[in-house]
Amino acid sequence: LLALAGFRGDPMLLPVSALLSGIGLMVQVRMGVFDGPERDPVDLLLLPGSVLLLLAVALAGMRGRYRLLAGRGSGRAALWVWALISVGLLAVLLATGQRFRGAVYGLGFLTPTELLKLSVVLYVAVYIQARLKALSRWKGLLPPLRVLAPLLAFWALLCAMLLLQRDLGMVLILNLALLVMLGLGTRHPGWWAYGGLLAAGAGYLLLGVFSHGQRRVEAWLAPFQDPTGAGWQVLQGLSGMYSGGLWGEGFSEARPRYTPIAESDFIYAVIAEELGFAGSALLLLLFLILLARLFTIAARARTPFGMLLATGIATVLSVQTLLNVGGVTKAIPLTGLTLPFISSGGSSLLTVFVSLGLVLAISDGEPPRPKSSGSRSKAGAAARRSPGVPATGVKGRRTGSHPGSRRSKPG
């Protein structure tokens, strides 16, 4: 479909995404996610539906049409739209959600916060691109606080609503995305310095206030102190990866049922157990290729909004992948985040594919500008004024000569 529509964007993004999705589907089938009488038949349509949605978004946003998401002028209307969607998702979740294993889910165990990632990235991209010059002008060591005030007010409300749900992982993802978008968008080093200081201070305060985060840090530092309780999931995942060795125990030969939430949070441990270090390393290589392409597309984007939007999406996927794999391998504390493409979850899959559709549209670039007739007429006029100089020559340099241009040597 993209080829028929004249797509001129990145040729690697879609194949790598298809490989990751295929691996995820294969692992979910092996885990028996689609088995059982209680399983919703709609789950079988999630992957093909997500692929069609990706293609639809990419086709709709081609030739620079993705810029319609930023609105017109200052983008004030678009800012209100994305802000209301973001706050509305969290408000509905707080009002109707149900708590399960430390997270708050919507009806049918949907996760509206997955859609929140995209709406917040769109809000930040619109906000920064409309105020790019102002955000780049600092007064000494102070950022432009007056320009930042609306963004900070929205951000405080957003983080407060997420903390009411004890969703520390989402708070971390969104704050890192904001920092990277500000840093790369304005190219001012001050954002990185302030962001690092604020992240360290906020992390210390949050761990001191929320017992949920404290227990996860304790289970990370000393899982054997409570091997049948808080440390059970980490220890089972590590045991499975250790038993997988280099080549694994074979596909469908492992016993991941002993690991809690193996089909979601700990799906990477299942892959490492069955396919070994080689299989899990190949999976990480595919993720690395995908994320590298996302950041490359962001760097080559022809508009500030396209660059910021692609940067935000790439950062969200990068941080989420890092937090999931890092938590499973005990490199960092568990965050309860899923692994994109691989873990079970319809909301996550839909959001990832819509995001990739937008990045594909950004990679397609702007429509080619036709040559104006005015420029051709000017070139023709210049040629008539100087008959000995071709019209296609470089400005300020003669590309040809006429008989009177050379000086004759003295006889």
Where are the predicted features?
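Hydrophobic alpha-helical segments of polytopic membrane proteins
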Residues: 145-208, 220-221
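Hydrophobic alpha-helical transmembrane segments
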Residues: 49-53, 273-294
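Hydrophobic, glycine- and aromatic-enriched re-entrant/interface helices and adjoining loop segments
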Residues: 99-109, 183, 191-283, 301-309
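Hydrophobic alpha-helical segments of membrane proteins
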Residues: 164, 168, 172, 248, ...
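Transmembrane alpha-helix boundary/anchor motif
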Residues: 123, 208-212, 289-293, 317-320, ...
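Loop-to-helix entry and N-terminal half of a specific, functionally important transmembrane alpha helix
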Residues: 295-336, 342
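Membrane-helix boundary/helix-loop-helix interface segments in multi-pass membrane proteins
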Residues: 1-166, 325-339, 344, 348-354, ...
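Juxtamembrane membrane-interface segments at transmembrane alpha-helix termini
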Residues: 25-33, 89-98, 183-193, 203-213, ...
